[in-house]
From Swiss-Prot:
Protein name: NAD(P)H-quinone oxidoreductase subunit 6, chloroplastic
The species this protein was found in: Lotus japonicus
Enzyme Commission numbers on file: 7.1.1.-
Regions that span the bilayer: 10-30, 32-52, 63-83, 92-112, 152-172
Keyword Transmembrane (UniProt): yes
Length: 176
């Protein structure tokens, strides 16, 4: 968006704060419904950050897929669960939590050290070796469609099969 710098910075800080608070709510809230709603807040803040960075197609995809489908499915699944079984054996800290914290911290540190050294310009504009897409010739939506039907056809189909299996599993669980 073409916003004044002060408004852009304010929105960036506001959405970043919402993102941090929502993600802390996902992890720290003990009620699964509140945790799922915090996940929805986090995903909406991410899509608004995409809008702020002029990635409107990615923002629309984020809202439709994650907030509109995945988060609704999570809330639907949480409402079918029996809530009493989660509060019987509640421990504040376990060995698995410590191991998970160590693994996540090491992944976070490796990402923080790797991301600034990456040449993102070459990754974004180069599709195959020695082939560069001209920005003025085709729009971003057409580029995404071309990539999904050529370069990323197999991963796209594999993801659709995985989602179909998850949908069938959800139907089987709901019928029981």
């Amino acid at each position: 968006m073409d916003l004044p710098k002060t408004l852009h910075d304010f929105l960036l800080v506001f959405l970043g704060s919402g993102l941090i608070l929502g993600s802390l709510g996902v992890v720290l809230l003990t009620n699964p419904i509140f945790s799922a709603f915090s996940l929805g807040l986090t995903l909406v803040c991410i899509s608004l950050l995409y809008i702020l960075s002029n990635s409107h197609f990615v923002a629309a995809s984020q809202l439709l897929i994650y907030v509109g489908a995945i988060n609704v499915l999570i809330i639907f699944g949480v409402m079918f669960m029996n809530g009493s079984e989660y509060y019987q054996d509640f421990r504040l800290w376990t060995v698995g939590d410590g191991m998970t914290l160590m693994v996540c911290t090491s992944i976070f540190i490796s990402l923080i050290t790797t991301i600034p050294d990456t040449s993102w310009y070459g990754i974004i504009w180069t599709t195959r070796s020695n082939q560069i897409i001209e920005q003025d010739l085709i729009s971003t939506s057409q580029q995404i469609g071309i990539h999904l039907s050529t370069d990323f056809f197999l991963p796209f189909e594999l993801i659709s099969i995985i989602l179909l299996a998850a949908l069938i599993g959800a139907i089987v669980v709901a019928r029981q």
